[in-house]
């Protein structure tokens, strides 16, 4: 006896329906960001479980409540930062990252700028940050340190980080800049000073003729392999004396 034609086609129809449903679920997941959220949750979980000791040759000098209570309200005189750099040099610091945007002269004490520039020069290995300049909502250029500081510094690096849609920073671009990705990320700028052979693994991108030189350019995206929460890194409050 021959089977009815409808029963022969039923498995095909069912598999087609299942396949179509899977495709639709995948499309909806991609549009709604469900897969991205799952991926980031797994990534965060792996990083939380994977801990490694913080480097013992890195110290964070923080601007915290104790520092503000001791020195006074922000912003501080640049003589304070100069004194801190001098103390770091005397203590034998191999390098200093001064994570402050120094794009304008000191309005109340011009001599403080020269004091800070001298301290940067004498230390010999100070890295300064640069960042994006904006006009309204548009990126319009670069915010760089004043020449007096840039000339004294050993290196300048960009301080941009990438924030994901959930507001968490998990990655950076190792090279960025307006018109061309010419500036290393500030941590890479430090590595280039202290361990140039290790930094050679992250060379600058080739200069392309097809780049839009009126746009902010980025290259070499990298997820940050966090060693854990910030607490393990030795941190001390600012004490200039």
Predicted regions located by residue number:
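Non-transmembrane functional regions of envelope-associated proteins
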Residues: 2-223, 227-229
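Terminal and domain-flanking low-complexity segments
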Residues: 232-234
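Extracytoplasmic
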Residues: 239-241
């Amino acid at each position: 006896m021959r089977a009815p034609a409808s029963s022969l086609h039923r498995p095909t129809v069912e598999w087609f329906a299942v396949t179509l449903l899977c495709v639709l679920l995948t499309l909806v997941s991609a549009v709604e960001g469900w897969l991205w959220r799952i991926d980031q949750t797994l990534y965060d979980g792996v990083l939380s479980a994977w801990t490694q000791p913080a480097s013992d040759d890195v110290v964070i000098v923080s601007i915290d409540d104790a520092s503000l209570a001791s020195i006074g309200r922000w912003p501080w005189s640049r003589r304070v930062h100069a004194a801190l750099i001098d103390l770091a040099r005397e203590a034998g610091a191999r390098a200093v990252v001064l994570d402050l945007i120094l794009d304008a002269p000191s309005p109340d004490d011009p001599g403080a700028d020269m004091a800070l520039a001298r301290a940067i020069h004498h230390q010999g290995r100070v890295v300064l940050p640069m960042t994006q300049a904006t006009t309204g909502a548009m990126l319009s250029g670069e915010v760089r340190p004043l020449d007096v500081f840039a000339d004294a510094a050993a290196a300048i690096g960009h301080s941009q980080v990438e924030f994901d849609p959930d507001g968490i920073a998990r990655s950076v671009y190792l090279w960025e800049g307006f018109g061309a990705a010419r500036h290393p990320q500030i941590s890479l700028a430090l590595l280039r000073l202290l361990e140039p052979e290790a930094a050679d693994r992250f060379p600058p991108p080739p200069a392309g003729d097809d780049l839009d030189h009126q746009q902010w350019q980025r290259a070499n995206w990298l997820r940050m392999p966090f060693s854990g929460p910030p607490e393990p890194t030795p941190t001390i409050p600012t004490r200039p004396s």
